[in-house]
C-alpha cells in the first residue's frame, strides 16, 4: 500500500515527467513485489480473471515481467528487480488487513459473476490478486533466463532499493509507492513498469502514463523539513506499519512536525496512547534491514531457457515469445553488451 497520502505534500516542481528513452544507460532498482502486483491486477481477461496456463496456474505476472522488462531494456534502462524478504513484525496488522480485503473481494467477485456483471467482476478480481511464493520463484527464474539481475532483500524491497540508490549503485529506485523517499532514496521513479497507453479502472477511457521522477532533496527543501521530519509526517498520517493518528492528514501533520520539531513531541502533544508503535515505525524507516550481498550484472540472455519456462511450462504462444526474444537479444547487444557498459554495470559487493 505504501504512504499514498504523502503525494499531497509533494511539490509539483519536485516532479518531473520523463520519457522512457531519457532513462537510457541509467540503472534502476525496481520494487519487484510492487511491480508484480501491478501486472497481476492489470493483465487480465474480459471477465477479470488473470491469465492462466493449461494447468490453471496464473501467468499474468510472467507475461508482464517478460514483455515490460524487454520494453525497458530496449530503451536502454538497466533495470534490476529487488524482492522482499521477511516482513517486519510491524507489518503484521497491515498484512492481516490486506488478506481480509482480498477475501472480501473474492466473495464480491463470485457474486458479480453470478449476476453477470462483467465490470464489477473485473474490479473485484483485480482487488483479489495474490502473489504466491511459487509465483515469486518463477519470476526469479525468468529474470535469470533473461540475463536481468535480481536482488534478495533481507526485509522490505523498497528499503533495499533505496539503499542501493543512496550508495550510488543505481541511479534511482522505482516503485508506485512513496516509501522509497522515506527509506532515503535520493531519487524515486514512478510508473516505470506501467508506462504507455493504459485503460482507467471501470471506465472505457485510456490515458497516456509516463514515468515520473521525484527528487528527495527537492521535496525536503521545498517543504523546509529534514528527512527525519518527512518520516515523522508519514508515520502520523499512516503507513504500512502505523494506522495513522485520527484526524491528522498530510497538511496537518506537516504543520505539527514543523511546530514541535520531532515525532515524539507531536505524539505527546496529541495524546497518542500507542507512542511506541509510532516511534518503532519511525526508527524502522530510518534504519531498515538491508544487505550489501548483491551483484548487478546484466548477462547474456538464454533464449532456450526462456522458451522452456514460458512456452513449454506455461503455454505461452511460441511465435510471440520468439519474436520478443529477438527484441531482447537485439537490446542486449546494442544497449548492454559493450565493454564499457559492462564495466559501468558491474558492482561486486564486498
UniProtKB/Swiss-Prot annotation:
<dbReference type="InterPro" id="IPR029060">
    <property type="entry name" value="PIN-like_dom_sf"/>
</dbReference>
<feature type="binding site">
    <location>
        <position position="158"/>
    </location>
    <ligand>
        <name>Mg(2+) 1</name>
    </ligand>
</feature>
<dbReference type="InterPro" id="IPR006084">
    <property type="entry name" value="XPG/Rad2"/>
</dbReference>
<keyword id="KW-0479">Metal-binding</keyword>
<keyword id="KW-0378">Hydrolase</keyword>
<dbReference type="GO" id="GO:0017108">
    <property type="term" value="F:5'-flap endonuclease activity"/>
</dbReference>
<feature type="binding site">
    <location>
        <position position="84"/>
    </location>
    <ligand>
        <name>Mg(2+) 1</name>
    </ligand>
</feature>
<dbReference type="InterPro" id="IPR019973">
    <property type="entry name" value="Flap_endonuc_arc"/>
</dbReference>
<dbReference type="GO" id="GO:0000287">
    <property type="term" value="F:magnesium ion binding"/>
</dbReference>
<comment type="subunit">
    <text>Interacts with PCNA. PCNA stimulates the nuclease activity without altering cleavage specificity.</text>
</comment>
<dbReference type="InterPro" id="IPR006085">
    <property type="entry name" value="XPG_DNA_repair_N"/>
</dbReference>
<feature type="binding site">
    <location>
        <position position="31"/>
    </location>
    <ligand>
        <name>Mg(2+) 1</name>
    </ligand>
</feature>
<dbReference type="InterPro" id="IPR036279">
    <property type="entry name" value="5-3_exonuclease_C_sf"/>
</dbReference>
<feature type="binding site">
    <location>
        <position position="240"/>
    </location>
    <ligand>
        <name>Mg(2+) 2</name>
    </ligand>
</feature>
<keyword id="KW-0227">DNA damage</keyword>
<feature type="binding site">
    <location>
        <position position="177"/>
    </location>
    <ligand>
        <name>Mg(2+) 2</name>
    </ligand>
</feature>
<comment type="function">
    <text>Structure-specific nuclease with 5'-flap endonuclease and 5'-3' exonuclease activities involved in DNA replication and repair. During DNA replication, cleaves the 5'-overhanging flap structure that is generated by displacement synthesis when DNA polymerase encounters the 5'-end of a downstream Okazaki fragment. Binds the unpaired 3'-DNA end and kinks the DNA to facilitate 5' cleavage specificity. Cleaves one nucleotide into the double-stranded DNA from the junction in flap DNA, leaving a nick for ligation. Also involved in the base excision repair (BER) pathway.</text>
</comment>
<keyword id="KW-0269">Exonuclease</keyword>
<keyword id="KW-0235">DNA replication</keyword>
<dbReference type="Pfam" id="PF00752">
    <property type="entry name" value="XPG_N"/>
</dbReference>
<keyword id="KW-0540">Nuclease</keyword>
<dbReference type="GO" id="GO:0006281">
    <property type="term" value="P:DNA repair"/>
</dbReference>
<dbReference type="GO" id="GO:0008409">
    <property type="term" value="F:5'-3' exonuclease activity"/>
</dbReference>
<keyword id="KW-0255">Endonuclease</keyword>
<keyword id="KW-0460">Magnesium</keyword>
<dbReference type="InterPro" id="IPR019974">
    <property type="entry name" value="XPG_CS"/>
</dbReference>
<feature type="region of interest" description="N-domain">
    <location>
        <begin position="1"/>
        <end position="102"/>
    </location>
</feature>
<dbReference type="Pfam" id="PF00867">
    <property type="entry name" value="XPG_I"/>
</dbReference>
<feature type="region of interest" description="I-domain">
    <location>
        <begin position="120"/>
        <end position="261"/>
    </location>
</feature>
<feature type="region of interest" description="Interaction with PCNA">
    <location>
        <begin position="339"/>
        <end position="347"/>
    </location>
</feature>
<feature type="binding site">
    <location>
        <position position="179"/>
    </location>
    <ligand>
        <name>Mg(2+) 2</name>
    </ligand>
</feature>
<dbReference type="InterPro" id="IPR008918">
    <property type="entry name" value="HhH2"/>
</dbReference>
<feature type="binding site">
    <location>
        <position position="156"/>
    </location>
    <ligand>
        <name>Mg(2+) 1</name>
    </ligand>
</feature>
<protein>
    <recommendedName>
        <fullName>Flap endonuclease 1</fullName>
        <ecNumber>3.1.-.-</ecNumber>
    </recommendedName>
</protein>
<dbReference type="InterPro" id="IPR006086">
    <property type="entry name" value="XPG-I_dom"/>
</dbReference>
<dbReference type="GO" id="GO:0043137">
    <property type="term" value="P:DNA replication, removal of RNA primer"/>
</dbReference>
<keyword id="KW-0234">DNA repair</keyword>
<dbReference type="GO" id="GO:0003677">
    <property type="term" value="F:DNA binding"/>
</dbReference>
<dbReference type="InterPro" id="IPR023426">
    <property type="entry name" value="Flap_endonuc"/>
</dbReference>
<comment type="similarity">
    <text>Belongs to the XPG/RAD2 endonuclease family. FEN1 subfamily.</text>
</comment>
Amino acid at each position: 500500500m505504501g504512504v499514498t497520502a504523502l503525494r499531497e505534500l509533494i511539490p509539483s516542481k519536485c516532479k518531473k515527467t520523463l520519457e522512457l528513452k531519457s532513462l537510457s544507460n541509467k540503472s534502476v532498482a525496481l520494487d519487484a513485489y510492487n511491480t508484480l502486483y501491478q501486472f497481476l491486477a492489470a493483465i487480465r481477461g474480459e471477465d477479470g480473471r488473470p491469465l492462466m496456463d493449461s494447468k490453471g496456474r496464473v501467468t499474468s505476472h510472467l507475461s508482464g515481467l517478460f514483455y515490460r522488462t524487454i520494453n525497458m531494456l530496449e530503451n536502454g534502462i538497466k533495470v534490476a528487480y529487488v524482492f522482499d524478504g521477511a516482513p517486519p513484525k510491524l507489518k503484521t496488522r497491515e498484512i492481516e488487513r490486506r488478506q481480509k480485503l482480498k477475501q472480501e473481494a473474492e466473495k464480491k467477485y463470485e457474486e458479480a459473476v453470478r449476476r453477470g456483471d462483467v465490470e464489477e467482476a473485473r474490479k473485484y478480481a483485480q482487488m483479489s490478486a495474490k502473489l504466491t511464493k511459487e509465483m515469486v520463484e518463477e519470476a526469479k527464474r525468468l529474470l535469470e533466463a533473461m540475463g536481468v539481475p535480481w536482488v534478495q532483500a533481507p526485509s522490505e524491497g523498497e528499503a533495499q532499493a533505496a539503499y542501493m540508490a543512496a550508495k550510488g549503485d543505481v541511479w534511482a529506485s522505482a516503485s508506485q509507492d512513496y516509501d522509497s523517499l522515506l527509506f532515503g532514496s535520493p531519487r524515486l521513479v514512478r510508473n516505470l513498469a506501467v508506462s504507455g497507453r493504459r485503460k482507467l479502472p471501470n471506465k472505457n477511457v485510456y490515458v497516456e502514463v509516463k514515468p515520473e521522477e521525484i527528487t528527495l532533496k527537492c521535496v525536503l527543501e521545498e517543504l523546509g523539513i529534514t528527512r527525519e521530519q518527512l518520516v515523522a509526517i508519514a508515520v502520523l498520517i499512516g503507513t504500512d506499519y502505523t494506522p495513522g493518528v485520527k484526524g491528522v492528514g498530510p497538511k496537518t501533520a506537516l504543520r505539527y512536525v514543523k511546530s514541535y520539531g520531532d515525532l515524539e513531541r507531536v505524539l505527546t502533544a496529541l495524546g497518542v496512547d500507542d507512542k511506541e508503535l509510532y516511534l518503532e515505525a519511525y526508527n524502522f524507516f530510518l534504519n531498515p534491514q538491508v544487505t550489501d550481498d548483491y551483484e548487478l550484472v546484466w548477462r547474456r540472455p538464454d533464449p532456450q531457457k526462456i522458451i522452456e519456462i514460458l512456452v513449454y511450462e506455461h503455454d505461452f504462444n511460441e511465435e510471440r515469445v520468439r519474436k520478443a526474444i529477438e527484441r531482447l537479444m537485439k537490446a542486449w547487444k546494442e544497449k548492454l553488451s559493450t565493454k564499457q557498459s559492462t564495466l559501468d554495470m558491474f558492482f561486486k559487493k564486498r
